[in-house]
Amino acid sequence: MTKKIIFTGGGTAGHVTLNLILIPKFIKDGWEVHYIGDDKGIEHQEIKKSGLDVTFHAIATGKLRRYFSWQNLLDIFKVGFGVMQSLFIIARLRPKALFSKGGFVSVPPVIAARLLGVPAFIHESDLSMGLANRIAYRFATTMYTTFEQEQTLAKLKHVGAVTKVTGPGSRSVTSKQLEAVLEYFDPNLKTLLFIGGSAGARVFNRFITDHPELKEDFNIINISGDPSLNELSWHLYRVDYVTDLYQPLMEMADLVVTRGGSNTLFELLAMRKLQLIIPLGKEASRGDQLENAHYFTTRGYAEQLLEQELTLPHFQEKVREVFAKQSDYLSAMKSSSELQSPESFYQLLSADISSATKEN
């Protein structure tokens, strides 16, 4: 009988990336893979784009808000309907396990899995749990965490950051597209790379547009998320989205200016890239990026600049500070033991699934 596993998670790329890393490993080992998500969400787009042999099952999903809104009443019914749909899907498929990467869409499948006696494994990327994972934790078999947690909860298992990004200098920059970029860059200048999430990138895009004088002192790479900004000109390369070019562009950068999303932060740690973190504040998020940034700065991996302090003089001062202490940051990153390869995490997850199914 073919072993089956269900993945869930979505809403943002960060809630899909790890799933896309793990799914090929399960397929290679003969598993039949299914995915529960929102058919209008990024998870559906990414699964289709991947070309992986995965059956996608769409469910209703509602946003879980931390504040009062009349929409909460409607979304309670959506979540409830999503649980009913998930119960039907999971009961029909009878999988050995469910793996969740979080996001609002993941809550109904995790609840349904628990009700049907299917082991549910969750991964939390941030220093503190989001609301979806706080709810899902109650129904989970195990929650894997990227960060060391101060709270001691029975079902938590710290595994570090799972990243497929390889170490520094492991790829050569040889593509024609990159060669074209290098023709516009000055080899005598430092290269800054700006990268933010879908919403977080807008502040960086505006900052670069408002301060063309940056190009006098630096080569600028701007991963903008906005195709209307695409440009290759004197000391400036703006591109909306990258896949194969992601790590080569990172290798080109002397310093990466980023938001505080944990996936990107740990990828930069794996590559030992100098980082200036400008996290989303509490007015635009639940404050998880501020916590992530604090974690990285206190361990000597990066420098932080708050968004409300993002002026050209402050930015230039912080950049100078990072370069002045470059050896300290690189030494701290080199001695870090917070990373785990996808293969080792897959082996751990497989062993935990086997153990949980034997107990059942």
UniProtKB/Swiss-Prot annotation:
Belongs to the glycosyltransferase 28 family. MurG subfamily. The gene is murG. It is a peripheral membrane protein. One of its GO terms (biological process) is peptidoglycan biosynthetic process. It catalyses: Mur2Ac(oyl-L-Ala-gamma-D-Glu-L-Lys-D-Ala-D-Ala)-di-trans,octa-cis-undecaprenyl diphosphate + UDP-N-acetyl-alpha-D-glucosamine = beta-D-GlcNAc-(1->4)-Mur2Ac(oyl-L-Ala-gamma-D-Glu-L-Lys-D-Ala-D-Ala)-di-trans,octa-cis-undecaprenyl diphosphate + UDP + H(+). Pathway: Cell wall biogenesis; peptidoglycan biosynthesis. UDP-N-acetyl-alpha-D-glucosamine binds at T12, A13, G14, S198, Q289. It is found in: Cell membrane. GO terms for molecular function: undecaprenyldiphospho-muramoylpentapeptide beta-N-acetylglucosaminyltransferase activity. GO terms for cellular component: plasma membrane. HAMAP family: MurG (MF_00033). Its EC number is 2.4.1.227. This is UDP-N-acetylglucosamine--N-acetylmuramyl-(pentapeptide) pyrophosphoryl-undecaprenol N-acetylglucosamine transferase. It is an enzyme of class 2 (transferase). Keywords: Cell cycle, Cell division, Cell membrane, Cell shape, Cell wall biogenesis/degradation, Glycosyltransferase, Membrane, Peptidoglycan synthesis, Transferase. Cell wall formation. Catalyzes the transfer of a GlcNAc subunit on undecaprenyl-pyrophosphoryl-MurNAc-pentapeptide (lipid intermediate I) to form undecaprenyl-pyrophosphoryl-MurNAc-(pentapeptide)GlcNAc (lipid intermediate II). It comes from the Bacteria.
